Amino acid sequence: MAKREPIHDNSIRTEWEAKIAKLTSVDQATKFIQDFRLAYTSPFRKSYDIDVDYQYIERKIEEKLSVLKTEKLPVADLITKATTGEDRAAVEATWIAKIKAAKSKYEADGIHIEFRQLYKPPVLPVNVFLRTDAALGTVLMEIRNTDYYGTPLEGLRKEPGVKVLHLQA
């Protein structure tokens, strides 16, 4: 193991490492990482309190869940189930159905982000996650790009996040 450098020590990391050390079951660690990702990652995060350290903390939780998963789950479950206990095919089918039922590109974008927060490995086996993520991304791109060129310029300017620049000669 690499020597820990003092520059990386801080009270936030120490506090979270103590919380992570208390995780003893796959169910507990899965809920912990899902709650963490919903609260501290993505554009929809609920808090920026640990913005500098959230990736380090997420990595440590992922490590803990991975260890618990390999210690406590049957080998067959490692490649056929999510750590939530759900069957991989059911997860894939559920989320693809959700995004296909989306009424707008914004709703579809939210569904895709939520899937990533809840199922990013080690919660879901990597091969299943990547395949499902690609399928969701494909549907999202199709929704986003439907008749893009048919949208009037004024309609495009009203899209969330658009900033109109005026060039001066």
UniProtKB/Swiss-Prot annotation:
SUPFAM superfamilies: Methane monooxygenase hydrolase, gamma subunit. Disulfide bonds: none annotated. InterPro entries: Me_mOase_g (IPR004222), Me_mOase_g_dom1 (IPR015952), Me_mOase_g_dom2 (IPR015953), Me_mOase_sf_g (IPR036123), MethMoxGammaMmoZ (IPR054953). One of its GO terms (biological process) is methane metabolic process. Gene3D superfamilies: Methane monooxygenase, gamma chain, domain 1, Methane monooxygenase, gamma chain, domain 2. It is an enzyme of class 1 (oxidoreductase). The keyword Oxidoreductase applies. Its EC number is 1.14.13.25. It comes from the Bacteria. It catalyses: methane + NADH + O2 + H(+) = methanol + NAD(+) + H2O; methane + NADPH + O2 + H(+) = methanol + NADP(+) + H2O. GO terms for molecular function: methane monooxygenase [NAD(P)H] activity. Pfam families: MeMO_Hyd_G (PF02964). M.trichosporium has two forms of methane monooxygenase, a soluble and a membrane-bound type. The soluble type consists of four components (A to D): protein A, comprising three chains, in an alpha-2, beta-2, gamma-2 configuration, is a nonheme iron protein containing an unusual mu-hydroxo bridge structure at its active site and interacts with both oxygen and methane. Responsible for the initial oxygenation of methane to methanol in methanotrophs. It also catalyzes the monohydroxylation of a variety of unactivated alkenes, alicyclic, aromatic and heterocyclic compounds. This is Methane monooxygenase component A gamma chain. It comes from Methylosinus trichosporium. The lineage of its organism: Bacteria, Pseudomonadati, Pseudomonadota, Alphaproteobacteria, Hyphomicrobiales. The gene is mmoZ.
